[in-house]
């Protein structure tokens, strides 16, 4: 399993805000690393091997973790899709992705 790093999440967020409106910045620069470390900890110590379970954990952690001043849900979606892509998972286009992302943040 090829995991995603905090730096990759920050880069994804920055790329999103280059293209779309949003307030740049991070209230706590260490939060990205803390959130990703927590996800990696769960994977390691709970023996999680299911890619979709890890993807769900990533999406929820990023969307609810409020790493950034703006764009957390967009970043959560794109980071999760990137994680799945780098692990050779192909997804069909679906309008449900937006709904799932909003639900993950609730």
Protein language model regions, located:
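FIC/Doc superfamily catalytic core
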Residues: 1-106
